[in-house]
Design a protein with these regions (language model features):
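Extended catalytic cores of very large enzyme megasubunits
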Residues: 1-749
């Protein structure tokens, strides 16, 4: 398997002067590639040949290793293969001499200033990275160590301990060894202090009460991705829809221009109409007429959370759509598909309002045929708002049959990758839109929140220092995540959500950049133990219960771009590729486009990307390799990071790239079925997915035209003047979860 650990006793000096541990698997891959190029069948001696190459090495230079490969091929009598390997080396050297190397900060700086940097009031310009880190750090100090100003007099030992923990941990954020919740980077400060929902990337809750719908709007407006369930057992708890009183007077409701005001309009005016006397829900209700006069015009600046006001039209459209759905169901309960469409209308309001791109996942009962075919057989075209949520059937391990699983997979292959699937141990388990967090045992009428931090594996050094560095990063990530778990003030939500967060706090310490540094796979169990121990210690210090689930692997789309590493457990797309990022109205985007007009094409900014020579790319792994990595991460990171007594566990959220033909896809499906206990939610994508797009989000550089475009983007690049930006439009122009990989994409046949 290409993910085996490097051999630390031999250090290899790369062409850029850096050193990495010798990894025999890379030798095996190069030998097999030479056999393929020569059109010869692969042989059993390949491992023996790799051993001889390892024994041949003395200086540890890359060129010497390649010489040893040539000699080994010749010694074993494979002269044709050796010739192909020599040609391959020559072409690689020639191509390398012609390549331009992009500025390593080009994309990461753009991501930071576009999504996380806020307006620094003192200077009147956007924050630097250090200022953003300080903003989030100081928020935690205000919450947990308010007496820290008196520490010099020795009056507050508890505050001193907490302050030291916070200061030390955020130095690791400053050096980008770890990341806190990416929502805290965007909203840290007043925006989170008045609404703790903004701390968390995602949440999950069953739709078992009408209030869950208005709360979902509130959560999406707060920046949370929303996972929800319309399983029979949950939707069956909803009351029958009341009938409109024929001659009742019209009730007027003026909508406040806050996220609470928007969500209250949905709750009071549509979902749970009440009598004028406030006596509670009735069997019939009055018509509510909305007044939108207090809502700021589109384009106004939002001061607390940042961003631009969307105006009232999207809200009005949503309220009318949801009202129509309720009217069509008078005298009966809503069906799961109707609840799902209501939720999609709510999310569409958030998107159409220009506030942010919503992220949602809908879990449904596997026996619900309307939900199974929600995006199939033309149903998607008739209900375009269903694009707002990914749909996944809940498959209970031990109950679902292989034939039904195959049916779901077959339907997904014909319907743009949906429905997806989520394997659970009981129907009460749920997940967030990206699928890395497991929820179970939620209190009635409550939401569970994803509390995420991240370890940058690419920043872990090679060699003997790697283990201690990785464990230290795990400790810092656990400290920060435990501090985040104490933010449990959720205005507008049912009090039970706060009670749930206090009684059963969750933590999700994730890993990213594994493809940059597979050496960390040796230390996962030790790292998980550090996460558990640190969480228990810090939780006791701040008065929280220890988390039962502490480790996960999230997709890490945006966070990995900020760090300049591979995303989560995924390999890089290719050695060199062009990334297209959609143009938005944020000032950072406009600054980049102004400095680099030739990099803007068809509504996207084009970024040239080049990955380290020794990093793993998609072509290095087949589908089974990727699944085996997921299994290893579950076995050595997820399970060891789960305490006894937990009724669920977190997950490795991954998109598996699959090569079409030769039964490869079917072998991948077989592997998933045969290892159910290791898998919860996966997405599949064809290896050649970029061929499905005229302008793919990620485009491999493989033709002369692409080579010319890549080099042009590198040579003409000019650093934008981000610090001169004097407005705060940034944080509202982001996805409602931190992924890019949440979407289940087309499954190859």
């Amino acid at each position: 398997m290409p993910w085996s650990s490097p051999r630390p006793h031999i250090m290899i000096t790369k062409r850029d002067g850096s050193t990495v541990a010798f990894n025999r698997d890379k030798i095996v891959k190069s030998i097999l590639a030479a056999f393929n190029a020569a059109g010869e069948a692969q042989i059993s001696e390949v491992d023996t040949m790799a051993e001889s190459v390892e024994a041949c090495c003395s200086s540890g230079a890359v060129s010497e290793i390649q010489d040893c490969v040539e000699r080994s091929l010749m010694d074993y009598g494979y002269t044709n293969v050796a010739r192909e390997y020599i040609i391959y080396r020559h072409k690689r050297d020639e191509a390398r001499s012609l390549r331009e190397r992009p500025d390593s900060t080009m994309l990461s700086d753009y991501i930071f200033y576009n999504k996380y940097s806020r307006l620094d009031v003192a200077s009147g310009h956007r924050e630097t990275w250090d200022q953003t880190v300080d903003r989030v750090r100081d928020m935690h100090i205000r919450k947990y160590a308010p007496s820290s100003l008196a520490l010099a007099e020795g009056k507050a030992p508890r505050s001193l301990a907490i302050t030291n923990l916070i200061m030390e941990s955020f130095e690791a954020v400053r050096s980008r060894r770890v990341l806190p919740s990416m929502r805290s980077m965007q909203f840290g400060g007043k925006a989170i202090e008045v609404n703790n929902c903004r701390m968390y990337n995602c949440c999950y809750g069953p739709i078992d009460h009408p209030d869950r719908m208005s709360e979902a709007l509130y959560l999406l407006l707060s920046g949370c991705g929303v996972g929800y369930s319309v399983q029979w057992d949950h939707v069956g708890c909803l009351p029958e829809v009341s009938a409109l009183v024929p001659a009742a007077p019209v009730v007027h409701h003026t909508i406040e221009d806050t996220i609470e005001g928007w969500a209250s309009a949905l709750r009071v005016g549509v979902l749970v109409p009440r009598s004028p006397a406030g006596s509670g829900p009735r069997s019939s209700y009055e018509y509510v007429e909305f007044n939108y006069s207090l809502i700021r015009p589109a384009g106004s600046v939002l001061r607390t959370s940042g961003g631009i006001a969307p105006g009232h039209l999207a809200l009005k459209k949503m309220l009318e759509s949801v009202r129509a759905a309720f009217c069509s169901a008078e005298g009966r309960q809503l069906r799961p598909i109707e609840v799902h469409d209501i939720m999609c209308s709510i999310a569409d309001c958030v998107v159409s309002g220009g506030i942010r791109r919503s992220a949602m996942i809908c879990l449904f009962s596997s026996s619900d045929s309307e939900m199974v075919y929600a995006k199939a057989h033309g149903n998607y075209e008739g209900h375009p708002s269903r694009a707002m949520a990914n749909n996944s059937a809940v498959l209970v391990r031990g109950e679902v049959s292989r034939s039904f699983f195959d049916r779901i997979i077959a339907l997904a292959s014909e319907s743009y990758g949906e429905p997806g699937f989520v394997f659970v141990s009981s129907k009460d388990e749920g997940t967030n839109p990206c699928g890395e967090i497991g929820f179970s045992g939620l209190r009635p009428e409550s939401w569970g929140f994803c509390n995420l931090t991240e370890v940058n594996c690419a920043a872990v050094p090679s060699g003997s220092a790697g283990r201690s560095s990785f464990l230290e990063a795990c400790r810092y990530a656990s400290v920060i995540g435990t501090l985040q778990a104490g933010y449990t003030r959720f205005p507008f939500l049912s009090p039970r959500s706060g009670e749930q967060a206090l009684a059963a706090p969750l933590l999700g310490v994730s890993l990213t950049g594994i493809a940059d540094n597979p050496q960390v796979l040796q230390h996962l169990r030790d790292g998980a133990a550090v996460v558990l121990e640190t969480n228990a210690r810090v939780a006791k210090l701040i008065g929280l219960a220890p988390a039962l689930q502490t480790t996960c692997v999230k997709p890490s789309g945006t966070a990995s771009l900020l760090l300049g590493c591979a995303a989560g457990s995924h390999p890089y797309h290719a050695r060199r590729y062009i990334r297209r990022v959609r143009v938005d109205a944020d000032a950072a985007c406009l600054a980049y486009a102004e400095a680099n007009p030739s990099a803007v094409s068809d509504g996207c900014i084009l970024f040239p990307c080049m990955v380290p020579d020794d990093a793993t790319i998609r072509a290095d792994l087949n589908g089974i390799d990727q699944l085996e990595l997921v299994q290893a991460l579950v076995r050595d990171w997820i399970i060891p990071g789960t305490r006894a007594g937990a009724t669920s566990q977190h997950n490795v959220s991954a998109t598996i790239s699959v090569t079409s033909g030769n039964g490869t896809y079917h072998s991948v499906v077989d592997h998933v079925w045969n290892g159910l206990r290791f898998f919860k939610a996966l997405a599949f994508a064809p290896m050649d997915i970029e061929n499905n797009y005229a302008s793919p989000p990620l485009e491999t550089v493989s033709t002369p035209a692409q080579e010319a475009l890549f080099n042009s983007l590198v040579l003409t690049y000019k650093a934008p003047r981000y610090l001169s930006i004097d407005n705060d439009s940034s944080p509202m122009n982001h996805a409602a979860c931190d992924s890019e990989r949440c979407s289940v994409v087309h499954v190859p046949k």
